[in-house]
Amino acid sequence: MNSIELAINMELDSKKFYLEKAESTDDHGLKSIFHTLAEEESIHARILKSRAENLSYELVDTYGEIKNIFAEIGNYKDIIKQIPDALDVYNLALRNEQKSLEMYQKMLDETDDEKDEKIFEFLIEQEKSHCILMEQLIEMVSRPKEWVESAEFGVRKEY
């Protein structure tokens, strides 16, 4: 299996992961985020497949949709109730996104093809934005616990 095929499989695995998580929550905002991330992973796989087959493709940044959906997420306490292992899920998703980011960076470093460079640079930025989103979800779920555990130690950032 070559690196492009590996990348396609990784994107499709991520799509499956996000669809499973979308089905496991009742929170509309989280469901929307997971569905949007699944669609983005599907788009990434299509871009890579088109490039591998020398077909045309378009690099479209859809991260703005996720930022808008993020505002729809319900109360963080509800998220913890609905998905007891939410922190584990987000940490796993973050690790997966980081692996993708590292893989695309390696592929970028190893290619001399201008078209491949553009694709990998695009995918690196996409994966970075996914990492940021997961970090925000981790912080949102973690902060209530941290706040209670360390409330005596002073002023906390608002969230």
Go through each PLM region and give its residues.
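Iron-associated oxidoreductase/ferritin-like identity signal
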Residues: 1-159
